[in-house]
């Protein structure tokens, strides 16, 4: 019996700065997650070795030193070892507590702390210390902010460019739900080199997998940015294995091209825990290759498609391919 049933009171509000994960995180979403008895056995093609190299530890220590978060760690990315060992990282700004409860994601939910005004400078110093040539900046959703965090993104870009003018910058932004105009006005004034926003899955699965988000809104966000800053490539991605069909994936790819999205990533969804959405299928590498061929035929400037692909995986190579470098 729930606390509400026994006391007649609503559950207490989560205190600011408290991070909910797993079952606590997804307890109040509209379509309930049924915990799986055990995680599915992964096929051979998506098993990865997590190297514990000195370079990985050095980057982790540097992130802690500058009070920064990497999405590589927070989202339990399977490529963490490869990317960290290669001296790269995708930075997650605006804290590590998200205002959304997406049941596929391993980032914690709650009431976020106020923005750290020193974060843009700390991030810029870390990028300079690591001598990075290509940086991806993403964030948690911040529905508590008037601009959804767009100004904080812009401040981070500006500070990095001041210390590392040769570094290319890609932003992987939230959907700015209800804040599109103000967020894009700010973004257009300090645009990234690549503007990325993930659709994540097909429209039919949005209610179960992206509560609080809207498929058409996300498409419109990408198109609206493109109209403001035509020279900057736009990018989006899908996770496969949530219950979509191949035909639905192709249809979403067509919709992306109709909205002038330049770059596409497709990867396998991996269930972070028993309390997250269950994997419905493991897509074979040959199918990922077929999607890439179809995407190239549709006119995407770059398609990166494979079981271990994530939005920021080899992002520098994707961007160079899109720009014809």
Swiss-Prot record:
InterPro entries: Aldolase_TIM, Elp3/MiaA/NifB-like_rSAM, LIAS_N, Lipoyl_synth, rSAM. It catalyses: [[Fe-S] cluster scaffold protein carrying a second [4Fe-4S](2+) cluster] + N(6)-octanoyl-L-lysyl-[protein] + 2 oxidized [2Fe-2S]-[ferredoxin] + 2 S-adenosyl-L-methionine + 4 H(+) = [[Fe-S] cluster scaffold protein] + N(6)-[(R)-dihydrolipoyl]-L-lysyl-[protein] + 4 Fe(3+) + 2 hydrogen sulfide + 2 5'-deoxyadenosine + 2 L-methionine + 2 reduced [2Fe-2S]-[ferredoxin]. [4Fe-4S] cluster 1 binds at residues 72, 77, 83, 312. GO terms for cellular component: cytoplasm. It is found in: Cytoplasm. Residues 84-301 form the Radical SAM core domain. One of its GO terms (molecular function) is metal ion binding. Pfam families: LIAS_N, Radical_SAM. Gene3D superfamilies: Aldolase class I. SUPFAM superfamilies: Radical SAM enzymes. Pathway: Protein modification; protein lipoylation via endogenous pathway; protein N(6)-(lipoyl)lysine from octanoyl-[acyl-carrier-protein]: step 2/2. Binds 2 [4Fe-4S] clusters per subunit. One cluster is coordinated with 3 cysteines and an exchangeable S-adenosyl-L-methionine. Transmembrane segments: none annotated. CDD domains: Radical_SAM (cd01335). Belongs to the radical SAM superfamily. Lipoyl synthase family. This is Lipoyl synthase. The lineage of its organism: Bacteria, Pseudomonadati, Pseudomonadota, Gammaproteobacteria, Pseudomonadales. The gene is lipA.
